[in-house]
Regions:
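Short coil-to-beta-strand transition motifs
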Residues: 17-24, 98-104
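Compact, glycine-rich, soluble single-domain proteins
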Residues: 51-70, 85-86
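Catalytic strand-loop segment that frames the active site of acyl-thioester-processing enzymes
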Residues: 20-55
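A residue-level detector for short acidic-glycine micro-motifs
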Residues: 27-30, 90, 95, 110-112, ...
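Small-residue-enriched segments and motifs
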Residues: 23-26, 86, 91, 106-108, ...
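Short aromatic-glycine motifs in intrinsically disordered, low-complexity regions
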Residues: 9-19, 80
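HotDog/MaoC-like acyl-thioester-processing domains
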Residues: 3, 69, 99-100, 105, ...
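Hydrophobic beta-strand-centered segment that forms part of the acyl-chain substrate-binding groove
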Residues: 5, 69-105
Length: 146
């Protein structure tokens, strides 16, 4: 599915609980068969900034948000619940200067799992240079009962 009109219609707010300034996923560029590619914007008020730049380890949050979006997209008919990182299986960092107002491209692929818990792998790029790659597991949190 690479129809840009359809992709722009994806309501990211429906799938991610994050709001500005923490939500960095700004656009879905491509989505097909258990993988997604997103644009992520690094804003000046981003809480992860260090000395005016986005650290490579922040790629973990970019991958988590992109993976959470993918989890929601693959389960569109199910009730949406908040998910969190429960395990980081592996990661690789590269020293890359990612400035404020940068657009990063993040790819995520669903490796295994279901709506309750799933494993993803992916990469984050700035200017076509990979600065983060990793594998993580997300689990949806239990719905609070009263």
């Amino acid at each position: 599915m690479s129809d840009r009109v359809y992709l722009r219609a994806i309501d990211i707010d429906r799938y991610l609980p994050h709001r500005r300034p923490m939500r960095m996923v700004s656009e879905v560029l491509d989505y097909a068969d258990q993988q997604v590619r997103c644009r992520c914007r690094i804003e000046a008020d981003n809480p992860l900034l260090e000395d005016g730049s986005f650290p490579a380890r922040g790629g973990l949050e970019l991958l988590a948000q992109t993976s959470g979006l993918l989890l929601g997209l693959t389960q569109q008919d199910a009730e949406q619940r908040v998910a969190g990182i429960v395990q980081v299986k592996s990661f690789r960092l590269q020293a890359v200067h990612v400035p404020v107002a940068a657009d990063c491209i993040v790819q995520a692929r669903l490796l295994a799992g279901n709506l309750d818990a799933a494993q993803f792998e992916g990469e984050a790029y700035y200017n076509e240079q990979e600065f983060f790659a990793g594998t993580l597991m997300l689990a949806q949190l239990l719905k609070e009962t009263t």
